[in-house]
Amino acid sequence: MTAKIGIIGGSGLYKMEALTDVEEVRLTTPFGDPSDAFICGKIGGVPVVFLARHGRHHHLLPTEIPFRANIYGFKSLGVEYLLSASAVGSLQEAVKPLDIVVPDQFIDRTRNRISTFFGDGIVAHIGFADPVCPALAGVLADAIADLNLPDVTLHRQGTYVCMEGPAFSTLAESNLYRSWGGTVIGMTNLPEAKLAREAEIAYATLALVTDYDCWHPEHDSVTVEMIMGNLQRNVKNAQAIICETVKRVHAHPPVSKAHRALKNAILTPLDQVPAATKEKLHLLLAKYL
C-alpha cells in the first residue's frame, strides 16, 4: 500500500484512532530499521501512513530515533506530505500550556545526530531558509482555526528550538533560547525536517504545548508527569486536527517547493557518484538520473 500523506506521532500520539483498513508494514532501509512498523490505512477514505516516532511503546530516546530510516521509509511508501505531531515546551508567556503552535522556523541545538542522507561520494546542499513547507503549514493552521476547538489557542508561526535531550533545559539554557526569540522547545523535529527536505517531502509540524519549560517564575519546572497530563488533553484535539488536515490535503494538494528541493542542490556529477552510493540513494535520486 502507498499513500501521499504521512503522519509522525510524537509523545502521547502512538496511534490514529480514525484509521481504517489497517495494515502494518515493516521495512528495512539502507539506513537501518525505522522506529516501528508503518501503519498503513485510511482516514475518511484517504490513504495515509502513520509511524510512532519513539516506537509504539516509547522505547527510543530522542537521540536514538532512526531519523534517516524513518524518512526513507515514508519516501518508499510514496509519501509526499508529512505531518509531524510533537510535544513541546513554551518559551514565551503568550504561548500557554495546551496551546498549539504551527512553527515556521527551527533552531538546531542537536549534536549527536546524522542530519543528511548524503556523503560517501555525493555532496548536496539543500535550501533550508524556510524549514517547513509554508503551503502545508498553512493548510494545517487553517484546519485548526476552522475546527474552532474549545480552549485551544492557535499560533500560526513560531520558532522551534530543537535540543538534544534527553534531559530538559537548565534555567540558563531556557533563558538563552528565550533571548534568541525561541517560541517552543522540543527534542525531535531535527534532523527530521532536514531529512524530509532532502527526500523532497513537504513537512509541517503540529506542536502541542505541554509546559513552560523551566524559565517561568510562577510555574513549576517541567516534569514528565506534567507533560503527559497536558498531552493527554491535547491528543484528542491532535487526532481531530490531523483528520481534518488529511481531508484538505487530499482534496487540494498544496504546491510545495520541497518537492523539487534536490533539483539544484547536488554538486557532484551523478556519473561520478560511486555505484554503491547511487544504489543506496536511488529512491531520492531516481528522477535526476
From Swiss-Prot:
Known partners and oligomeric status: Homohexamer. Dimer of a homotrimer.
Pathway note: Amino-acid biosynthesis; L-methionine biosynthesis via salvage pathway; S-methyl-5-thio-alpha-D-ribose 1-phosphate from S-methyl-5'-thioadenosine (phosphorylase route): step 1/1
TM stretches of this protein: none
The protein's name: S-methyl-5'-thioadenosine phosphorylase
Species, as recorded: Thermosynechococcus vestitus (strain NIES-2133 / IAM M-273 / BP-1)
Binding annotation for phosphate: S11, R53, H54, S86, A87, T188
Family: Belongs to the PNP/MTAP phosphorylase family. MTAP subfamily.
Enzyme Commission number(s): 2.4.2.28
Uppermost EC category: transferase
Site (Important for substrate specificity): S169, V224
BP terms from Gene Ontology: L-methionine salvage from methylthioadenosine; purine ribonucleoside salvage
Catalytic activity, as annotated: S-methyl-5'-thioadenosine + phosphate = 5-(methylsulfanyl)-alpha-D-ribose 1-phosphate + adenine
Cysteine pairings via disulfide bonds: none
GO CC terms: cytosol
